Amino acid sequence: MADNMTTTQIEVGPGATNATINFEAGILECYERLSWQRALDYPGQDRLNRLKRKLESRIKTHNKSEPESKRMSLEERKAIGIKMMKVLLFMNPSAGVEGFEPDCMKNPSNSNCPNCNWADYPPTPGKYLDDIEEEPKNVDDPTEIVLRDMNNKDARQKIKEEVNTQKEGKFRLTIKRDIRNVLSLRVLVNGTFLKHPNGYKTLSTLHRLNAYDQSGRLVAKLVATDDLTVEDEEDGHRILNSLFERFNEGHSKPIRAAETAVGVLSQFGQEHRLSPEEGDN
């Protein structure tokens, strides 16, 4: 080993099991940060969810074998995992964890290994979710339907009238229901709809879906990406129907915007973007 190369020990707990769990927790944190920046596709989001479930289960099992003073939560392990990554990749590229050493440390002639220069790489460009505008600029003079304190019969009639007169183009639907003290969300949908000769309405593109709680706090944000473009007519029709089916069923139970939001988000596998509290409501 070259004299100028050292091994930096990171406190991860005894044994490779803790090192592995903590490192995977760091990977989970990276996945979550990518998700916050809309940088994960659907398979990536699925891997995030599976990794989180796996880690939660493994940590729960592992903690049972540890003294109470040494048990760590997922969040604590994330912090250690991120520290491991920083030391390995950025602060000291030649570092080792729990006695494991990079290949370039084992071969002194390879001390200028290009893989150790990752700290010089710029961060991935992109906007954070909070930097994205609440309302898209490209929706000019949209048709807007607002349902507030209406019974189901009136709500269905208003939806029917507005949808039947809408030709095509940008469309905005706002649902705000608070009937009989039933908590609801305000759901705002921006999309481009096509009207076909057979009378079908198809959603060609979903630009945005925002869901707000009663205090106006944004609890779900689905922003348009290439993955949200609906290319199949039947898929578009199915998604559009999910917006209105609860009004057309005619049941007496008050229609809840939260259910509509979950229905639309689930079409894209994005229902996790609703907080558990709002999802339950």
UniProtKB/Swiss-Prot annotation:
Region (RNA-binding and homodimerization): 1-93
Principal location: host cell
Pfam families according to UniProt: Flu_B_NS1
Chain spans, region G1P2-binding: 1-103
Domain of life: Viruses
GO biological process annotation, one example: symbiont-mediated suppression of host PKR/eIFalpha signaling
The UniProt record lists the keyword Ligase: no
Name of the featured protein: Non-structural protein 1
Organism, as annotated: Influenza B virus (strain B/ID/1986)
Taxonomic lineage from the root: Viruses, Riboviria, Orthornavirae, Negarnaviricota, Polyploviricotina
